[in-house]
Amino acid sequence: MVNVPKQRRTYCKKCKVHRVHKVTQYKKSKERKASQGRRRYDRKQKGFGGQTKPIFRKKAKTTKKIVLRMECVDCKYRKQTPLKRCKHFELGGDKKRKGQMIQF
């Protein structure tokens, strides 16, 4: 399990100094209906002939790489940094303490 704090003090390219950054997890946005690839695919699918492009079915990976989106508190400049693959990701969870009992 990976636990990342909600704020990180790191270098800002725009300010050119270390500043506090607000950390969020990157999420894929909704696909655009008018993008060139979508228009081409829709045009190809029209009419007779069934499915024209292969539908990908051989999934190999069980996890995705976590991408952190960091936004500078002062200038609102955003940067993204990838982490390693992990099954469980937590943003701003409780820190581990030595010698503490596990509570459920």
Curated annotation (Swiss-Prot):
Entry's family note = Belongs to the eukaryotic ribosomal protein eL42 family.
Known Pfam families for this protein? Ribosomal_L44
Basic residues bias: start-end ranges: 23-43
PANTHER family from the entry?
60S RIBOSOMAL PROTEIN L36A/L44 (PTHR10369)
Gene of this entry: RpL44
Q: Name one GO cellular component term.
A: ribosome
Outline the segment boundaries, as ranges, of region: Disordered. Answer: 23-60
What's a BP term from Gene Ontology annotated to this protein? Answer: translation
Q: In its UniProt entry, what is this protein called? A: Large ribosomal subunit protein eL42
Q: Which Gene3D superfamilies match?
A: 3.10.450.80
Instruction: Report the GO molecular function annotations.
Output: structural constituent of ribosome
InterPro entries xrefs:
Ribosomal_eL44, Ribosomal_LSU_eL42, Ribosomal_zn-bd
Which keywords annotate this record? Ribonucleoprotein, Ribosomal protein
